[in-house]
């Protein structure tokens, strides 16, 4: 099975140690003590983000490791072949993808995805799996960029957390930049299985993921079936 868990916001970077969505990710591997690989490229390998990652995952029954691109880079193919799950941190989506492409990590991730490694991440780490995404890589405005395209469609994280997100998605729909857009609120994730089975995972308080489109000129937000991790 091919799986992507795209988190709209929250989790390890914001509430280190809680571990709700992180345990959910580990559970999808089907392993008793899975190996998980953290990729914090989007923040330039932020030390604080790595601390939060280990604070969370060290409390869970797994083997957590991370990748540094801005030190001496290890054998990527060997490391990725040992993983059951990948977790990509948030930050600058555009810069992250450029680094990955230069190192060939995008191709290695695709191979791992196709062989059943669970792909996950938050914000930039959610954007990257789709064909295109709404990103804040520029200081002054939200833009749409091409991503890796493991799954078809467009994605917007932080849908309820940042005031410019909803109106920007509306504008992209009106301008025919998007036909539809997947969007996840903070503390919600969109779990996609085999590219056609969608589930919204709520690890906050009634947080949701949507399929957003224009219907007769008005924005339509259709909520996906949801699973709450707090009940």
Which sequence ranges carry the predicted segments?
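General beta-strand structural signal in soluble alpha/beta enzymes
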Residues: 6, 66-68, 87-88, 120-122, ...
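Catalytic nucleophile loop
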Residues: 87-90, 113-132
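Glycine/threonine-rich flexible loop motifs
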Residues: 93-103
